[in-house]
UniProtKB/Swiss-Prot annotation:
Homodimer. Functions in the biosynthesis of branched-chain amino acids. Catalyzes the dehydration of (2R,3R)-2,3-dihydroxy-3-methylpentanoate (2,3-dihydroxy-3-methylvalerate) into 2-oxo-3-methylpentanoate (2-oxo-3-methylvalerate) and of (2R)-2,3-dihydroxy-3-methylbutanoate (2,3-dihydroxyisovalerate) into 2-oxo-3-methylbutanoate (2-oxoisovalerate), the penultimate precursor to L-isoleucine and L-valine, respectively. This is Dihydroxy-acid dehydratase. It catalyses: (2R)-2,3-dihydroxy-3-methylbutanoate = 3-methyl-2-oxobutanoate + H2O; (2R,3R)-2,3-dihydroxy-3-methylpentanoate = (S)-3-methyl-2-oxopentanoate + H2O. Its cofactor is [2Fe-2S] cluster; Mg(2+).
Length: 560
């Protein structure tokens, strides 16, 4: 059987002579038309350090594909720097870019009849966007992560991007000198790679390795270290073998493999964004997976890894301690993941992990043994109540007591909330409500790292609650609840909260409640009027018009 199963539709036969002429113009030879055409979706960009080191990996992918007998076809995918856009109008485009990237991959693979695709990505939305595009196209595919960043150093301490956000709060509170503030700003990010903790990019890369769509050890390598280039060439070779075997993403991404990925997210203390993105990934794969499935996995999987933002270590430390294979083998030995899931290697999870010890090495404390976890249960809790009947997501690690009842401080945009924090108008015991920031209302469900970082910097991270229908950065920790659904713009109860109302956040009982009578809530609901759309044309207007609820992934192609 030919391995150019799809591309032969545009390269073979008399009628395709004009097509071949165009290929000849790019240096193709006649023999090349029998080889598979394999796309390389290249996310290289000088917009952000997360993506500024990707070109060498795209080049390595091309070399590996061609050495294995394929034709490599490079095309570009865009990126948004979440870190730079944070706290500005630009953050509204971040989640939008996930859909744009997915559309790019699906469109190029479909339009060019590619036989396979290798996606190279770095910044946060590159990850789910690329995976969604691969699943929609459903040709043999592999994800190559651009690698994590190494830590910065100052006064003997490791630094990362979140160090700078938290320094803003410390400096404005008068708890940090200008010299220290400037040095942290200059030293936090020493080179290329994605933000170094178990933030969104590293969470998603780790999950993709567990899912079976990336090679073992691929998710925690540093961008600036040499092994990542050789690893990319190996990924390209493996992809060509998958093309020969016709092993497709939807053969790999199943309900059981998604459960494996979510188990690893819980075990590593990963980002709240993983909930939103895996709902979207499951939708792209045609797999039934709901927000309640995250809670089901959370209750049985412990947090094993001591990783930032709520722990001590960075992704590169996890890599040196055994990486995701060690985390997975520890979970597999405890019966907490499925060993029979097929992976892009053509082998099962159990086969890939056969040479990995059942327990972590004793000479490290990044990965805990199953008998001595960081926490007995996972950290991403799904809260429900009259404020979030469809669900909301709380990250509960690092908190002495993940519950609070206090007066609401209500803000209809992020900027006014941040200004109130900076002006020291927020007190311990308050519950901040940031609303009209959901998929429809934001639009684009922006992340709230600036306010949460400022709260932590002012020493209020555990004593002030913050709820929002927007999202949080993977670098966020504290008494925070995001993805509140239904969102304010859709008439959710969060739109009805008034200044001073009592609100309860309780991660013990998984409750998020507005402590107001049902009669009063009904009265307010009857008086509520939907706000006018903030945008009436362009990409943000399209997103606001078509995005589903956060509780179903905020996707644009859920038409039922």
């Amino acid at each position: 059987m030919s391995i150019n199963r799809r591309s032969k539709n545009i390269t073979e036969g008399v009628a395709r002579a004009p097509n071949r002429s165009m290929y000849y113009a790019m240096g193709y030879q006649e023999a090349d038309f029998k080889k598979p055409m394999i796309g390389v979706a290249n996310g290289h960009s000088t917009i952000t350090p997360c993506n500024s080191g990707l070109q060498k990996l795209a080049d390595a992918a091309v070399e590996g594909i061609e050495a294995a007998g394929g034709n490599a076809q490079i095309f570009g995918t865009p990126t948004i720097s979440d870190g730079m856009a944070m706290g500005t109008e630009g953050m509204k485009y971040s989640l939008v870019s996930r859909e744009v990237i997915a559309d790019c991959v699906e469109t190029c693979v479909g339009g060019q009849w590619m036989d396979g695709v290798l996606v190279v990505g770095g910044c946060d939305k590159n990850m789910p966007g690329g995976m969604m595009g691969m699943l929609r196209a459903n040709v043999p595919a592999i994800y190559v992560y651009g690698g994590t960043i190494l830590p910065g150093k100052y006064k003997g301490q490791d630094l990362n991007i979140v160090s700078v956000f938290e320094a803003v709060g410390q400096f404005t509170a008068g708890n940090m000198s200008e010299e220290d503030f400037c040095q942290i700003e200059r030293r936090a990010i020493p080179g290329s790679g994605s933000c170094g903790g178990m933030y969104t990019a590293n969470t998603m890369s780790s999950a993709f390795e567990a899912l079976g769509m990336s090679l073992p050890f691929a998710s925690t390598m540093a961008n600036v270290e040499d092994p990542i280039v050789a690893h990319t060439k190996e990924a390209a070779r493996v992809l060509v073998e998958a093309v020969k075997a016709d092993l497709k993403p939807r053969d790999i991404v199943t309900r059981k493999s998604i459960e494996n990925a979510v188990a690893v997210i819980m075990a590593t203390g990963g980002s709240t964004n993983a909930v939103l993105h895996f709902l979207a990934i499951a939708h792209a794969a045609g797999v039934e997976w709901t927000i309640d499935d995250f809670e089901r996995v959370r209750r049985k999987v412990p947090v094993l890894c001591d990783l930032k933002p709520s722990g001590r270590y960075l992704a590169i430390d996890l890599h040196r301690a055994g990486g995701i294979p060690q985390v997975m083998k520890t979970l597999l030995a405890a019966g907490l993941i499925h060993g029979d899931c097929i992976t892009i290697t053509g082998r099962t999870v159990a086969e890939n992990l056969a040479d990995i010890p059942d327990a972590p090495r004793a000479d490290q404390d990044v990965i805990r043994p199953i008998t001595k976890p960081m926490y007995e249960q996972g950290h991403l809790a799904i809260l429900k109540g009259n404020l979030s009947p469809e669900g909301a997501v709380a990250k509960i690690t690092g908190l002495k007591n993940p519950s609070i009842t206090g007066p609401a401080r209500v803000f209809d945009d992020e900027q006014s909330a941040l200004a109130a924090i900076m002006a020291k108008q927020i007190q311990a015991g308050d519950v901040m409500v940031l609303r009209y920031l959901g998929p429809m209302g934001g639009p684009g469900m922006p992340e709230m790292l600036a306010p949460t970082g400022a709260l932590i910097g002012q020493g209020l991270g555990e004593s002030v609650g913050l709820i929002t229908d927007g999202r949080f950065s993977g670098g966020t920790w504290g008494m925070v609840v995001g993805h509140v659904a239904p969102e304010a713009a859709a008439g959710g109860t969060i739109a009805l909260v008034q200044e001073g109302d009592s609100i309860t956040i309780d991660a013990h009982t998984l409750v998020l409640n507005l402590n107001v009578s049902e009669a009063e809530i009904a009265k307010r609901r009857a008086a509520w009027k939907a706000p006018a759309p903030r945008y009436t044309r362009g990409v943000l207007a399209k997103f606001a018009k078509n995005a589903s609820s956060a509780s179903s992934g905020a996707v644009l192609d859920r038409f039922e």
